[in-house]
Amino acid sequence: MKIDILTLFPEMFAPLEHSIVGKAKERGLLEINYHNFRENAEKSRHVDDEPYGGGQGMLLRAQPIFDTIDKIDAQKARVILLDPAGRTFDQDFAEELSKEDELIFICGHYEGYDERIKSLVTDEVSLGDFVLTGGELAAMTMVDATVRLIPEVIGKETSHQDDSFSSGLLEYPQYTRPYDYLGMTVPDVLMSGHHENIRKWRLEQSLRKTLERRPDLLENYAMTDEERLILEKIKTEIERTDTVNEQNNL
């Protein structure tokens, strides 16, 4: 995969030279190029200007962005504009991007963009309902989430398939040595060596965590009959616990 990032602050992307993304570059699975679009601004070197019609703040000018992208050999690239008004980035979109050969990220750093920049763009994307100073942190997050899904980047394919959201559910609790730490012990089922019981426990824990923390994920989740039965059992247990607590508070 080839990724080009348009930014006024290339130095902010130093963390991408490490960990999984850095290793992917070393192994030739990934190429990342950073383009300071100020270098392509006209003689004034100004990349921003006041909005027509008045208003607060400055807008990113179209010319530096157009000229920078013209110099990138990426006619088939998917061009992503980091914008708070864009679609919310999620695991499904990361999976989608991981199948692309070329990506371009445009990071703004002002009040907004000249609307004409969007004529270059295939996707306007946001991390969520909040505003960042610039698009750099959002771009780093999206690059990291996307690159780790590229085949061969992570050793075992199941390493990311079991992640929260990859299956549609939140991930089950996990433990490592020691068995007992400060009186907190590993659930016995994980020590049993019984693979089927461990699978069922993990599935139940994933469903329970998702129901308690992100019930919205269950609305569009295609459940198996087994999962449906387990979820009903969990709901019944929660209702019983709530009833007991209410009675104790009387």
From Swiss-Prot:
Main location: cytoplasm
Lineage: superkingdom: Bacteria
InterPro entries membership: Alpha/beta_knot_MTases, tRNA_m1G_MeTrfase_C_sf, tRNA_m1G_MeTrfase_TrmD, tRNA_m1G_MTases_N, tRNA_MeTrfase_TRMD/TRM10
A Pfam match: tRNA_m1G_MT
Recorded catalytic activity of this chain's protein: guanosine(37) in tRNA + S-adenosyl-L-methionine = N(1)-methylguanosine(37) in tRNA + S-adenosyl-L-homocysteine + H(+)
Binding-site list for S-adenosyl-L-methionine: G108, L127, G128, D129, F130, V131, L132
The protein's enzyme class: transferase
EC code(s) of this entry: 2.1.1.228
GO molecular function: tRNA (guanine(37)-N1)-methyltransferase activity
Statement: the UniProt record of this protein carries the keyword Transferase: yes
Localization: Cytoplasm
One GO location term (cellular component): cytosol
GO biological process annotation, one example: tRNA N1-guanine methylation
Keyword Cytoplasm: yes
Position of the signal peptide: none
Keyword tags: Cytoplasm, Methyltransferase, S-adenosyl-L-methionine, Transferase, tRNA processing
Similarity remark: Belongs to the RNA methyltransferase TrmD family.
Binding partners and assembly: Homodimer.
Cited function: Specifically methylates guanosine-37 in various tRNAs.
HAMAP family associated with the record: TrmD
PANTHER family, sorted: TRNA (GUANINE-N(1)-)-METHYLTRANSFERASE
Protein name (database record): tRNA (guanine-N(1)-)-methyltransferase
Gene behind the chain: trmD
